[in-house]
């Protein structure tokens, strides 16, 4: 009987993953990793996915400011034992999972989608002026600018005289 990876993570997996994420973020913030490929590089731990048995963890990273992450990942893989010890000091679990480091593709994908949404063809289809073009009007909506206020804070019109 094997578990499938389709299942959503349990609360325990999520909690332990967050603890590991915070612990690694603290280690990276302090700059205690001495590998030259990692030293001085600002990293963000975006997510930690942990296996159901809590023995393996995949750590997803992004380099702040962009740039290639290949050399940094190689350095982190070399420093895996050191990082595992640092995590063990900071979290209190029976076992500390084996750490695997990967680049987080979600930010690149979000940038790709954002680029698609800002293409002139898409803006035309949506009826939105393409970015960078301005109609020269700073008012959001000035079609009936009669000085009257509308909305929740506006005064109600006077009641009509009925029967007088």
UniProtKB/Swiss-Prot annotation:
- Region annotated Disordered sits at 123-164
Location relative to the cell: Cytoplasm
Coiled-coil spans are: none
Q: Does the keyword Transferase apply?
A: no
**Listed Pro residues bias regions:** 155-164
What does this protein do, in the record's words? One of several proteins that assist in the late maturation steps of the functional core of the 30S ribosomal subunit. Associates with free 30S ribosomal subunits (but not with 30S subunits that are part of 70S ribosomes or polysomes). Required for efficient processing of 16S rRNA. May interact with the 5'-terminal helix region of 16S rRNA.
Quote the subunit structure annotation. Monomer. Binds 30S ribosomal subunits, but not 50S ribosomal subunits or 70S ribosomes.
Return the protein name. Answer: Ribosome-binding factor A
To which species is this protein native?
Rhodospirillum rubrum (strain ATCC 11170 / ATH 1.1.1 / DSM 467 / LMG 4362 / NCIMB 8255 / S1)
What gene, per UniProt, encodes this protein? rbfA
């Amino acid at each position: 009987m094997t578990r499938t990876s389709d299942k959503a993570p349990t609360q325990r997996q999520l909690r332990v993953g967050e603890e590991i994420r915070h612990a690694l973020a603290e280690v990276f913030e302090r700059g205690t990793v001495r590998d030259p490929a990692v030293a001085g590089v600002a990293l963000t731990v975006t997510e930690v996915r942990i296996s159901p048995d809590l023995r393996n963890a995949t750590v997803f990273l992004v380099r702040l400011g962009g740039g290639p992450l290949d050399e940094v990942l190689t350095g982190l893989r070399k420093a895996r034992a050191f990082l595992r010890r640092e995590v063990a000091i900071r979290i209190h679990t029976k076992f500390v999972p084996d750490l695997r480091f990967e680049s987080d593709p979600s930010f690149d994908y979000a940038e790709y989608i954002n680029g698609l949404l800002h293409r002139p063809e898409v803006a035309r289809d949506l009826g939105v002026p393409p970015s960078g073009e301005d109609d020269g009007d700073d008012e959001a909506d000035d079609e009936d600018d009669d000085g009257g206020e509308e909305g929740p804070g506006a005064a109600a019109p006077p009641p009509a005289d009925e029967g007088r």
